[in-house]
Amino acid sequence: MTGNGADAMKKSRSIRKDNLAGYAFISPFIIGFLCFTVIPMGASLFLSFTSYDLFTAPKWIGLDNFKEMFTGDEKYWQSLKVTFTYVLAGVPLRLGFALFIAVILNNAAKGTAIYRTLFYLPSIIGGSVAVAIMWRNIFGNDGVINALLFFVGIDQKILWYQNPTSALWTLILLSVWQFGSSMLIFLAGLKNIPSSYLEAASVDGANRVQRFFKITLPILTPIIFFNLVMQTISAFMTFTPAYIISKGEGGPLDGTLLYSLYLFQRAFNYFQMGYASAMAWVMLVIVGLITLILFKTSSYWVHYESKEE
């Protein structure tokens, strides 16, 4: 009995040491998660029910921030309208262009690695301040786009940033340019499609277009779904291009006033931290609901290969 008891104690000590080692290894993540995610989110939730300007103590006002947001702030609804337009137009265009380039690269005989790297670069630098400034100059009154239009015979300069509609579309085009990450994922999916499927369809008389829509596209639907969710979330968080192109104002006539930009204005231009926190939580709910809808509707169009196959 004594020997068994000693063995049990040794085993218990060994387990405790293993547990301590495990906790030590994951402690940096836990500390970082608490300090940079949980605590800031909790503070933001509290501040959303207060009036807070960074210089005085937060004052509890209940739901007043949310009431003002939904009933008395026309700019808020404009920012929602601009953001949803940006997402609904930009995400499908970006995914469509990414899939188009991926199909071309998948069929390329040589140089795939080089082109893959070149096409991915915009995703790395596309959201940077430097690229946004470059984009603003390209579409400026004396920029490259107007110079090309003059070269083909269009003498009238287009004031891209003086019109709310065209200004927003320049932002959308900039977002489409950042297609590289989705393209790489699509390309990986295309490489994994069994060639036997396409060969069998070809033997049955299916042409290239039919093979794409009847075989390739259905097999890619899980990847399309993944890219759709990720790009939708990313689009709702877009800030830098709108800030640089509109010089932080969201103009003209609030035509480029994305939600994140308006949140920034409320927080750091007007120091309404409580209101900005409320906006952040509303956006979290909106993105969460849209993501939930995408997951719920995915069963109607996303096709997964069964485990038996």
UniProtKB/Swiss-Prot annotation:
It holds the Pfam family BPD_transp_1. The chain crosses the membrane at residues 29-49, 84-104, 114-134, 167-187, 217-237, 275-295. Residues 80-294 form the ABC transmembrane type-1 domain. It is a multi-pass membrane protein. Its main location: membrane. CDD domains: TM_PBP2. It comes from the Bacteria. InterPro entries: ABC_transporter_permease, MetI-like, MetI-like_sf. The keyword Transport applies. It is found in: Cell membrane. The keyword Lipoprotein does not apply. GO terms for biological process: transmembrane transport. Part of a binding-protein-dependent transport system. Probably responsible for the translocation of the substrate across the membrane. Belongs to the binding-protein-dependent transport system permease family. MalFG subfamily. This is Probable ABC transporter permease protein YesP. The gene is yesP.
